């Protein structure tokens, strides 16, 4: 009995496993899998359609074709289970074994596996230390290789050509062995003593000094130690036995008309078997060497094609001239096994249809067509019908459902009640692309969708389709209801703002009823309460827009979270009172006492969610929607051609601009301005004109003059339909209105350059032919761009998801002390992102102190919600240290304290949340909104850079930060550092403005001074760079020879003479060696030193410098000794939009990157080479660092200046790798976060910083070993952080030296491929390469990430699956004995079930036998 239970259990359960390992298969292993050798290339008999014996479909090897029936028909039915037929040799069993039984082919000659040969770096090549070309020559029989030199003077592994081999034979006879082909390689591989080689390499590595050699040795050592650790043997990379795939995985399907469709693999296998058999025959016949050799080569090529067709030589083509699909093609690429069948499957119980709007639905409902529902819920209906006794069998139930009788519809209603369905719209760019709803049955064939979830789906009703899925199990329904219901997804996971917000018609309706109008009917009436207003409005006594006075009841939340009610009188518009009727208690009236634009409605809902909770918000959102639709219909707002009012001043403005352009053309003709300047000026003029026309138009459309009650004329906001639509945020924008009624303005060509002649007409007036074609010219490019953008954006999302997919919240607190500092993001005089937005929802890493009383305001580990962020703002604190994903020390995944708030839920993130994927989706989803083009800087932008002063915008106090200054005799300060900032704080002490202060700027205020708005606090000359002295003394010239290194020039206007340093190219041979400079000396002619160091005050003068002082002059601190003219930096293209984001995440090194200072110290210039300048930085302790910089690079530092480590010394885009190396992880994170946000901010997309931080954390997973210490790690090897930590912990226990590491930055593609999990990497990109590397190393995949678990078909270890896996691991940890005891116990019900199943499936006598046994 127990055995019976065990057998039935075992048939049901799949094997439990915790990890997957991939290894090379030895020939013995291949034979052990096999059920027999395939000897013939035949497939099936063309007459009987039965498989040929010993052929590719042989039933004897692979199993029967029909269940429990042998091929010749002698044994049929279940009772013969397990019998092997003596006539045809087929085992009687299930036919599905033909999916799992393998065969094999014994190869007559060994064959190299193409992956280990050709997949770079070639593993066979590395092991033998022979180049790939040479190995190919041996394999394809073009050269001999010496396998055993014996006593001769040949080298082992030396290649011999045919002639050389014959010569050697003559010379040495049989003293040596040389072979060719795979046998030779196999023999060489077999002779390698892996252990000895590893030892030898390790010793050699310690002695060698050359960089290239170390690299080469490390490569070999890696592969060899992989073989050593994994237990793979090198000779297994050469195949002697070829496994044959089970036949049902390479089927042969009869088509109508007697033809067959077959898998390409059968062709490839046939080819191998044919050649193998021919080779066997030739060997038996002792055929001539050259024929055998040719056959062996052909066999090698056939096996290559089977494993990876097209990897070497020409691909083998099928009958229809297309490449045959080999085994490698089966698994790689978009239509390979991984991406097509394992990561994405088609599912049952699903359907799709067009969507239409469902304005009467509640937020949690979706309208499901009856026809669809009937089909989707069929099994549920069948079981209900049988349960009710309306049908006795499934067949009867089916008939009832097909007839669609009334009882079926009643049961359908019952079945779908509270059974959620999932709706999905492709493309599913983020998790809100699939949400759950309760179905409501509707007539017709279209799915009805609630308008408020359109934003999340990015759906509109112009023919979009959506798919419906039915969650079947109870758990699935539970999760759908509690986690995926649309009512539970009110906030956007990317930024934590509401996403269930009204848009378009609803906004227009709400905006319309909350506007007020002068002199409307009922103006000035007074009402006792809101009900009276409603009655008055319904009886036409008061207009929607009339200003009235009403007594309202207002409930406000107090500190304790209770609602306190109070009465007050308000003067407001009647429509706002109608809206107030539906506003839940607890919201202040001020939120609706304004025209309700989209922004205002969003704010209202956000406030409601944060203060009154989810349920109230959802009900309120629905009410808002019904009201908005109602009054939008009522308002009668529509669009007519007369709504587009062209301003009267337009003609005048345009003719003025045309005059200006003519003037500039004249200047250009007379040579006063260059071509580039003319172009930029013209474009500037037209941009300005366009703005002026637009302004005139908006003034005309936005305001209308009306008479008030006294008959006076007053201005009020206009009721123009177009203005109302764009002002409310329902549809359209100022830019679009400008094209309709202003002027269309400048257009771009397809390459992005701007056409100088603008379109002066607008759409109201109509375009002429030329204008029409100008506008279509750039427009077509826009359409082409959109298509490209979608693909690019999708690929970026895929890479992001792949790199972050295994990042899950694994613990509550990792206990780290590390943190990052947050401050407001300020550029110049504008706060781009205030501190509150940056720290909201984070956890404090250090207590926050009150700057005035030094008392603790907030303790460490406080969760910063809205209320606590308000405290920070009240005390104007502008720097806090918070926990961050980058500094989290959780071993796998991340901890909830470091992550902070789950943006989509509003509380601290739960353990098990898949934050990696959420981050990837949040960054990828708005990708399609980003632009694709690179910007050319020109016109206004390029001239704005030449600023020459700092004027503060707000009144406050000055703080000088990191600013090194010297004081001049007149009392002004002069900046002598370049990374300094000037900060303006407001009266509360919050930072409002940040300004960079360039070297040599004169600063007219001191630290702590008060300034007024508009005051100029610093000035400098943007076109020259001054050399400023920091010490007082006497000036001495060095190497300044008149006529050689310098010339005197006299200014004709002023008569003043100045000294100019000549260019090195113009000097005579003797002058080339001279290095012109000035130095400062004291009274005794001894060198003076710069303050705080041993660096003499020498100032090297580059070519073109103007000297303003003469030799021997006395100078004071802060005096300008010389001026170096600055050419304004060339306009270069700025990569923007999507390509910029991709560059940042791929951590690409920019072209001509900025050169950063490697150490802190004083700058001096050494001897130049031919085309490079030499820059030397001397640290305070005397160590120096030299940097050779190409002459054409613009060096932004000067002799004698002090630079900090990581400061820019030659301009250019900064390289993230340099930032990481010199300034550390936090600076890098800050850089990437700000740069990515910059791109999204331009498009008005909000993404929380923490999502970008999560991706950066994944890019920093790996470290480089700088000193291996006593660990087994190799120098310069890239290893996961966690692995180094584990290795070091082991070493610490043994009191050894630990490995030292430095962080490295990997781009997202590299990081995905370098992940610990080979399954995840293989399913991402470069499948062959990943699998080759993994199999050689005998890699083990612990299935930690989400992707690996999806691929092996398990619950993912995130969300609800997280606890499931934890329990599984806990059970796995139990002792083996406990498990066995549990297995032995058979419950009564189990026994009964087992018995009944056994009786069902077998003949009566077997049941008798089972009873006897008992």
From Swiss-Prot:
Recorded superkingdom: Bacteria
Biased composition, class Low complexity, residue ranges: 1392-1403
Keywords from the UniProt entry: DNA-directed RNA polymerase, Magnesium, Metal-binding, Nucleotidyltransferase, Transcription, Transferase, Zinc
Binding note for cofactor: Binds 1 Mg(2+) ion per subunit. Binds 2 Zn(2+) ions per subunit.
Region listing for Disordered, in residue ranges: 1392-1414
Gene Ontology CC, one term: DNA-directed RNA polymerase complex
Positions bound to Zn(2+) 1: 70, 72, 85, 88
Any Pfam family hit: RNA_pol_Rpb1_3
Binding site for Zn(2+) 2: 814, 888, 895, 898
InterPro entries: DNA-dir_RpoC_beta_prime, DNA-dir_RpoC_beta_prime_bact, RNA_pol_asu, RNA_pol_N, RNA_pol_Rpb1_1, RNA_pol_Rpb1_3, RNA_pol_Rpb1_3_sf, RNA_pol_Rpb1_4
The EC number(s) this enzyme carries: 2.7.7.6
Gene3D superfamilies for this protein: 1.10.132.30, 1.10.150.390, 1.10.1790.20, 1.10.40.90, 2.40.40.20, 2.40.50.100, RNA polymerase II, clamp domain (4.10.860.120), RNA polymerase Rpb1, domain 3 (1.10.274.100)
Disulphide bridges: none
Membrane-traversing stretches: none
Record flagged with keyword Transferase: yes
Catalysed reactions listed for this entry: RNA(n) + a ribonucleoside 5'-triphosphate = RNA(n+1) + diphosphate
Amino-acid positions noted as binding Mg(2+) in the UniProt annotation, renumbered to this chain: 460, 462, 464
Protein family (similarity comment): Belongs to the RNA polymerase beta' chain family.
Stated role: DNA-dependent RNA polymerase catalyzes the transcription of DNA into RNA using the four ribonucleoside triphosphates as substrates.
NCBIfam families assigned to the protein according to its UniProt record, in alphabetical order: rpoC_TIGR
Oligomer status and interactors: The RNAP catalytic core consists of 2 alpha, 1 beta, 1 beta' and 1 omega subunit. When a sigma factor is associated with the core the holoenzyme is formed, which can initiate transcription.
Descriptive protein name: DNA-directed RNA polymerase subunit beta'
Species assigned in the record: Coxiella burnetii (strain RSA 493 / Nine Mile phase I)
Taxonomy of the source species: Bacteria, Pseudomonadati, Pseudomonadota, Gammaproteobacteria, Legionellales
Annotated gene: rpoC
């Amino acid at each position: 009995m127990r055995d019976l239970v065990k057998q039935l259990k075992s048939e049901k359960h799949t094997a439990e496993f915790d990890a997957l390992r991939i290894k090379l298969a030895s020939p013995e292993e291949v034979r052990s899998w096999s059920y027999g050798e395939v000897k013939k290339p035949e497939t099936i008999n063309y007459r009987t359609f039965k498989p040929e014996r010993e052929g590719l479909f042989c039933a004897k090897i692979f199993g029967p074709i029909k269940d429990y029936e042998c091929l010749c028909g002698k044994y049929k039915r279940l009772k013969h289970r397990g019998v092997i037929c003596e006539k045809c040799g087929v085992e009687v069993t299930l036919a599905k074994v033909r999916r799992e039984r393998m065969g094999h082919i014994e190869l007559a000659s060994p064959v190299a596996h193409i992956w280990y040969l050709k997949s770079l770096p070639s593993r066979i090549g590395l092991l033998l230390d022979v180049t790939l070309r040479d190995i190919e020559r041996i394999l394809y029989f073009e050269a001999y290789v010496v396998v055993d030199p014996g006593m001769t003077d040949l080298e082992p592994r030396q290649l011999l050509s045919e002639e050389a081999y014959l010569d050697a034979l003559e010379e040495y006879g049989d003293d040596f062995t040389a072979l060719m082909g795979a046998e030779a390689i196999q023999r060489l591989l077999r002779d390698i003593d892996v252990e000895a080689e590893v030892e030898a390499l390790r010793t050699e590595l310690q002695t060698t000094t050359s960089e290239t050699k170390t690299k080469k040795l490390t490569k070999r050592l890696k592969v060899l130690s992989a073989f050593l650790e994994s237990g793979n043997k090198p000779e297994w990379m050469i195949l002697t036995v070829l496994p044959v795939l089970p036949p049902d995985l390479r089927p042969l399907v009869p088509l109508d008309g007697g033809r067959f469709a077959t898998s390409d693999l059968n062709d490839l296998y046939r080819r191998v078997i044919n050649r193998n058999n021919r080779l066997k025959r030739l060997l038996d016949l002792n055929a001539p060497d050259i024929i055998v050799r040719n056959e062996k080569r052909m066999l090698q090529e056939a096996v290559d094609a089977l494993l990876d067709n097209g990897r070497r030589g020409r691909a083998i083509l099928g009958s229809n001239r297309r490449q045959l699909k080999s085994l490698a093609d089966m698994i790689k690429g978009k239509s390979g096994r991984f991406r097509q069948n394992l990561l994405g499957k088609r599912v049952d119980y699903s359907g799709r249809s067009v969507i239409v709007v469902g304005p009467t639905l509640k937020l949690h409902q979706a309208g499901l067509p009856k026809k669809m529902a009937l089909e989707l819920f069929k099994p549920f209906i069948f079981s209900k019908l049988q349960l009710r006794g309306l049908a006795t069998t499934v067949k009867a139930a089916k008939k009832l459902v097909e007839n669609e009788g009334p009882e079926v519809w009643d049961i359908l209603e019952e079945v779908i009640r509270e059974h959620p369905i999932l709706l999905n719209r492709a493309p599913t760019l983020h998790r809100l692309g699939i949400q759950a709803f309760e179905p409501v049955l509707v007539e017709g064939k279209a799915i009805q969708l609630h308008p408020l979830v359109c934003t999340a789906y990015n759906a509109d009703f112009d023919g979009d389709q959506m798919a419906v899925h039915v969650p079947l199990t109870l758990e699935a329904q539970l999760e759908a209801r509690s986690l995926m219901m649309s009512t539970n997804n009110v906030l956007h996971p990317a930024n934590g703002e509401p996403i269930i917000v009204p848009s378009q018609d609803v906004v227009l309706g709400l905006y319309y009823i909350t506007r007020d109008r002068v002199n409307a009917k009922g103006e000035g009436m007074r009402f006792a309460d809101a009900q009276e207003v409603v009655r008055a409005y319904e009886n036409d006594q008061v207009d929607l827009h009339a200003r009235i006075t009403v007594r309202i009841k207002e409930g406000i939340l107090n500190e304790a979270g209770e609602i306190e009610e109070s009465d007050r009188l308000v003067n407001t518009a009647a429509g706002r009172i109608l809206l107030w009727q539906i506003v839940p208690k607890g919201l202040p009236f001020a939120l609706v006492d304004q025209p309700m634009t989209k922004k205002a409605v969003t704010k209202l809902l956000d406030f409601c969610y944060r203060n009154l909770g989810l349920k109230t918000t959802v009900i309120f959102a629905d009410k808002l929607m019904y009201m908005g639709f109602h009054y939008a219909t009522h308002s009668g707002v529509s669009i007519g051609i007369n709504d587009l009012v062209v301003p009267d001043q337009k003609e005048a403005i345009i003719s003025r601009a045309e005059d200006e352009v003519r003037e500039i053309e004249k200047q250009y003709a007379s040579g006063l301005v260059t071509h580039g300047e003319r172009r930029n000026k013209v474009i500037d003029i037209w941009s300005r004109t366009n703005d002026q026309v637009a302004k005139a138009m908006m003034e005309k459309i936005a305001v209308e003059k009306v008479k008030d009650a006294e008959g006076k004329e007053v201005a009020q906001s206009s009721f123009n339909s177009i203005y109302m639509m764009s002002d409310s945020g329902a549809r359209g924008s100022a830019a679009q209105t400008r094209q309709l009624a202003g002027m269309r303005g400048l257009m771009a060509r397809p390459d992005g350059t701007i056409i100088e002649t603008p379109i002066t007409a607008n759409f109201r007036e109509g375009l002429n032919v030329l204008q029409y074609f100008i506008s279509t010219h750039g427009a077509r490019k826009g359409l082409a761009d959109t298509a490209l953008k979608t693909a690019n954006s999708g690929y970026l999302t895929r890479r992001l998801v792949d790199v972050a997919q295994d990042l899950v919240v694994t613990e509550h607190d990792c206990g780290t002390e590390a943190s990052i500092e947050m401050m407001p993001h300020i550029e110049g005089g504008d706060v781009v992102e205030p501190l509150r937005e940056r720290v909201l929802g984070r956890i404090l890493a250090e207590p926050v102190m009150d700057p005035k009383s030094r008392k603790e305001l907030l303790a460490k580990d406080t969760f910063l919600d809205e209320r606590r962020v308000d405290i920070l703002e009240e005390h104007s604190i502008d720097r806090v240290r918070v926990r961050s994903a980058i500094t989290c020390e959780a071993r796998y995944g991340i901890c909830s304290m470091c992550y902070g708030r789950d943006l989509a839920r509003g509380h601290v993130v739960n353990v098990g949340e898949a934050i990696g994927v959420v981050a990837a989706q949040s960054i990828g989803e708005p990708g399609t909104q980003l632009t694709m083009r690179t910007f050319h800087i020109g016109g206004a932008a390029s001239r704005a850079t030449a600023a020459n002063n700092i004027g503060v915008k707000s009144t406050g106090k000055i703080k000088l930060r990191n600013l090194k200054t010297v004081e001049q005799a007149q009392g002004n300060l002069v900046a002598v550092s370049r990374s300094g900032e000037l900060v303006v704080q407001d009266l509360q002490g919050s930072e409002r403005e940040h300004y960079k202060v360039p070297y040599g700027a004169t600063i007219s205020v001191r630290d702590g001074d008060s300034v007024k708005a508009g005051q100029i606090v610093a000035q400098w000359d943007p076109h020259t760079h001054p050399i400023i002295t920091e010490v007082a003394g006497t000036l001495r010239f060095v190497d300044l020879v008149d006529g050689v290194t310098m010339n005197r020039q006299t200014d004709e206007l002023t008569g003043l003479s100045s000294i100019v340093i000549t260019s090195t190219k113009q000097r005579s041979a003797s002058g080339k060696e001279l290095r012109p400079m000035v130095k400062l000396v004291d009274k005794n002619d001894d060198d003076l030193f710069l303050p705080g160091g041993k660096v003499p005050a020498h100032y090297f003068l580059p070519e073109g410098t103007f000297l303003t002082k003469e030799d021997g002059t006395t100078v004071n601190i802060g005096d300008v000794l010389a001026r170096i003219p600055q050419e304004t930096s060339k306009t270069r293209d700025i990569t923007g939009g999507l390509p910029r984001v991709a560059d940042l995440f791929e951590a690409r090194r920019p072209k001509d990157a900025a050169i950063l200072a490697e150490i802190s110290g004083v700058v001096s210039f050494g001897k130049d080479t031919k085309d490079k300048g030499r820059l030397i930085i001397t640290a305070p302790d005397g160590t120096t660092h030299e940097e050779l910089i190409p002459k054409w690079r613009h060096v932004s530092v000067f002799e004698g200046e002090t630079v900090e480590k990581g400061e820019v010394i030659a301009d250019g885009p900064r390289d993230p790798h340099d930032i990481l190396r010199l300034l550390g992880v936090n600076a890098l994170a800050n850089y990437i976060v700000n740069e990515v946000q910059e791109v999204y901010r331009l498009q008005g997309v909000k993404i929380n910083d923490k999502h970008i931080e999560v991706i950066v954390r994944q890019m920093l997973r790996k470290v480089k070993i700088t000193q291996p210490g006593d660990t087994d790690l190799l120098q310069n090897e890239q290893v996961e952080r966690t692995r180094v930590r584990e290795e070091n912990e082991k070493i610490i226990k043994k009191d050894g030296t630990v490995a030292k590491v430095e962080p490295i930055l990997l781009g997202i593609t590299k990081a995905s491929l370098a992940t610990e999990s080979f399954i995840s990497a293989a399913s991402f990109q470069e499948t062959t390469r990943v699998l080759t590397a993994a199999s050689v190393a005998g890699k083990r995949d612990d299935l930690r990430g989400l992707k690996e678990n999806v691929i092996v078909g398990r619950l993912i270890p995130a969300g609800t699956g997280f606890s499931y896996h934890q329990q599984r691991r806990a059970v796995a940890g139990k002792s083996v004995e406990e498990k066995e005891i549990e297995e032995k116990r058979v419950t009564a019900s189990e026994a009964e079930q087992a018995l009944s199943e056994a009786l069902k499936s077998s003949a009566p006598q077997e049941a008798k036998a089972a009873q006897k046994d008992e």
